[in-house]
């Protein structure tokens, strides 16, 4: 496999501003890890959220909620595990793995509630809760992934505790706009007794993430 890493202020030079913004307050510089493998077959890109520790930022988590936040890189770990399996079994794929790796920390230059940020794609985002940082780093990584026009993009993330509220601890919620992928995933989940639950793209909800000040509202949690 070939691996390249974009670190610190180089993220700004490479137009990955959201990854830089989320991680700039930490002593360890934010970075984007880019792994590629394989020269034939369909193009598969995996994107994993790599928030290596999450304090919540200026919207600081309570102590009881912060204790396990070293696990907020679960998406990155999962895609690396899947990539290892793909490479070890020699699957006929052109594989790419993108991991935005950051710590969401607190310092004088941390991003703030009510900041307006511009993403790689050019969309602006109003920050109303700095503890919703995962979707920011994924946004830039997914935009980069899409530029390569892969046959399929799969992202994995410990994105929100609201998933547990919605479907409980036993079901893994997911979104997909690919009916064939949905059928394959649901079949595999049933075969291996590892249940998943498809979440809806419900058009009437779209105005809830369009605040008017920016193109998008980061979160409904204020």
Protein language model features and the residues they cover:
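A generic structural signal for tightly packed, nonpolar segments enriched in small/aliphatic residues
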Residues: 2-221
